[in-house]
Amino acid sequence: MKINNKEYTIPELSFNAMCKLEDMGVNFADMEKKTLSTVRGFLALAMDGNLDKAGTELEKHLASGGNIEEVVTEIGKEVEESGFFQALKSQ
């Protein structure tokens, strides 16, 4: 995902990555209700777990006219295509 002209790569969304997101406060049942926290968590995952740095980058991104919906769409695509969620859907 591109934030402030920097490209961040969300790591493979494995079981362990999902646990890290939960440890950072990203609750998959509340993803639609807590969009900003979810986006910050995924960006932090791409930034070695630094929630404060991720929040600062997102704030700068929005202040400079960046679009949060594009980031949300990209995260949704990554989640849907992850092997972890594919396995869950097939159960």
Label the predicted regions:
Residues 36-37:
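Amphipathic alpha-helical repeat elements characteristic of tetratricopeptide repeat
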Residues 2-7, 15-16, 23-33, 49-91:
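Charged interaction scaffolds used for protein-protein
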